[in-house]
């Protein structure tokens, strides 16, 4: 009986392991990309939403598993709850999992007609994880932005019944890429100790803390103003969006502690989520096809 119960727990344990691989990217990758897809696509069925979510998570997990295989030492300091440093899975098992996920990712691409998106994404994650470009701060942000853009691109296509992006929909996804390319280093403030241990050269380590934080604040404020002007949300939504931006920036500017930076990064995720759902207002006004 105990053996049967133990076997019954394996699927739950495996799902928890997958969740722990992607947990830290839920605020800044999963939620924003799902939100923007729901906003940009025409109203869709629950079946398409589940299909898009699984495609989204399959692509995210493929990147995260390989990235965490290469970053065990770093994660043992900054994120000990992750599957590899906590011992839930061995490096060998994780490598096998990565290969299976990569294969399934391409099966999903063929099945959902998102081959172009998955091709761009595959090139991006390979050059990021295996090409050594993650060590170059500006390139790291750009590739991260391309990855986020691909999550939005592919998920939107699935939600929209296979239609390719065009017009304001394409503009919205390009805005997401631009936002993350210029502000994505917000995630690196919380990992300074681990990044320094691993020898990574992130923007928060290359620049002084005041310069790194105030430049992030300036860019984020500029995007906030620009997106409000572009998408023209109602006044109450504008106030809420600005409030999220100010809370995020106040956190980064008022404390340099990495624990506080983790909280500020969560607020950054909410601000990014807000940035991604603002195109709903052109849709409500009938400006999106």
From Swiss-Prot:
Q: Which residues cross the membrane?
A: 35-55, 95-115, 142-162, 165-185, 222-242, 262-282
Q: Does the keyword Transmembrane apply?
A: yes
Q: What is its main location?
A: membrane
Phenotype caused by lack of the gene: Completely abolishes the production of fumagillin and decreases virulence.
User: Which InterPro entries does this one have?
Assistant: Prenyltransferase_related, UbiA_prenyltransferase, UbiA_sf
> What's its top-level EC category?
lyase
Q: What is its EC number?
A: 4.2.3.211
Q: How does it sit in the membrane?
A: Multi-pass membrane protein
Q: What does it do? A: Beta-trans-bergamotene synthase; part of the gene cluster that mediates the biosynthesis of fumagillin, a meroterpenoid that has numerous biological activities including irreversible inhibition of human type 2 methionine aminopeptidase (METAP2). Within the pathway, the membrane-bound fumagillin beta-trans-bergamotene synthase af520 converts farnesyl pyrophosphate (FPP) to beta-trans-bergamotene. The pathway begins with the conversion of FPP to beta-trans-bergamotene by af520.
Q: What is this protein called?
A: Fumagillin beta-trans-bergamotene synthase af520
* Chain's gene name: af520
